[in-house]
């Protein structure tokens, strides 16, 4: 039986491209929300295959989160991939026409962070170091390259991040068809017929309904 508040690397692997990107966006929002910070600077959405300069989730804030492993810089860009991102593939994601992709160059100028997320990878420590080293080589001696933090998140490390946010664990389980009976994530639970009025009814009382 599944542990209620647990998620595995295999669970992460089962998410499709769009859900994977949404997961990273939700995690960034949750990190900021936990610190009482505005989530307006967490930008994600649109079509997964849209021409977005290589970044799928972008975080722009006045100040990073000192307590966060991935969001400690004020400007962070995530490139989210479902397939494996072997070292040989990395350069093509960072460099275009002999130079850094514009959004990655902008992150370097802002002393930001560029992070690749790959649910297809489950890296040992040496394999993780190889991928980050290839990222550094791809950036090379480009202007402001020394200001840019680079990171790589595989499926195991992404699962670890998710475990810190129980509500997102339930969201992942629902997306892969393994939701728990009697539990659903924040969502529209009531059926509203087409053309019907869809609004919350508020008063000054607290009610608990057993189902």
Report the location of each language-model feature.
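Mixed-charge (Asp/Glu-Lys/Arg
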Residues: 1-210
């Amino acid at each position: 039986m599944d542990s209620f508040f647990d998620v595995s690397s295999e669970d992460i692997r089962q998410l499709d491209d769009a859900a994977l990107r949404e997961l990273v966006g939700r995690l960034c929002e949750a990190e900021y929300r936990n610190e009482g910070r505005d989530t307006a600077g967490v930008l994600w959405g649109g079509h997964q295959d849209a021409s977005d300069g290589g970044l799928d989730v972008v975080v722009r804030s006045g100040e990073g989160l000192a307590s966060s492993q991935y969001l400690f810089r004020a400007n962070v860009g995530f490139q989210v991939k479902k397939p494996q991102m072997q070292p040989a593939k990395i350069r093509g994601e960072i460099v275009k026409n002999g130079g850094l992709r514009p959004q990655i160059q902008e992150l370097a100028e802002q002393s930001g962070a560029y992070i690749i997320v790959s649910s297809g990878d489950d890296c040992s420590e040496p394999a993780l170091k190889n991928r980050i080293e290839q990222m550094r080589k791809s950036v090379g001696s480009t202007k402001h390259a020394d200001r840019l933090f680079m990171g790589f998140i595989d499926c195991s490390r992404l699962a670890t991040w998710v475990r810190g946010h129980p509500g997102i664990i339930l969201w992942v389980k629902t997306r892969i068809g393994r939701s728990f009976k009697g539990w659903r994530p924040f969502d529209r639970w009531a059926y509203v017929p087409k053309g019907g009025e869809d609004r919350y009814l508020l008063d000054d009382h607290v009610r608990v309904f057993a189902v």
